[in-house]
Amino acid sequence: MYYILYILFFISLSATTLQEIYENSGPANGYDKYMELNSNIIYRGGIGIFEGDIYIDCNGAVIDLEDGNGIWIYADEQYPSSLEIKDCSIVNGLYYGVSFGGTSNGKITNCNFLDTNFGVKMFDFTDVTITNSIFGNNQTYGIGIYTEYPILDISYSLFWDNESGDCWESCPGWGNIWTQFELEDNLEIIYNNPLFIDYNNFDFNLNENSPCINSGNPLLFDADGSRSDIGANSFNNSLCNIAGDLNQDNYINVLDVVDMTNCILFNECESNCFDLNEDDEYNVLDILVIVDFILN
């Protein structure tokens, strides 16, 4: 077991393209290829899958498609194939984040599809389940379905600022005409800004005011034991990530002093993370703690 983990860790550190990870990955846990990524690495480019059962656990890592192809998967009776992918942020795809074709099937859990053309595309007789995922700022649609045959099961997800629409379908005989399809209210879909920490710099951790926190599938749980969040990076409900980092930008600086001042003067204390000296009060002593962090 330790040997397998070491190999997975070594592969993640020694390769920066998703294609390299794919080529160097082997079977594990019932999958033909088992890919586990390192959250501290930004992986480049997509992959093509045409046979086998593939598992990708990004552990919160970013896959930057660099305006190229995304992850595509195709299957038929002779070469069946499936993709299970979780905890991934897939960004900057010229055509799509993930595309399913033929008779392939997939499961997408806690993934972000951002700044692609289509977040997810489905063709032919594909069958895909999506939960706890975010579709935002995609140039065309969050999800695009070609023909009436694909089966989409989606719940507990968020759509936000997709330029042409969120979920659209193009059926035979329509040419290039698309029609929007509405998701049922009972699917727990959110249409709002997910409030990432730093969208432009690929920090897709959730701000503590994010509507995604504890809004995921109630049958799934985050590492802190709370109800699952929506998105690739779960929010830790039990801890302040960095003591003194009140705005959660991963830095302790004058902006945190401003936040603490607003907390004291206007009672804008958004969490117990503001009580830095743990005296159950918000006052100038907490400001002094932040200043000490900055100076030392």
Model-derived features: where do they sit?
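Predominantly extracellular beta-rich ligand-binding scaffolds that present long acidic/polar faces
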Residues: 87-89, 97-101, 105-203
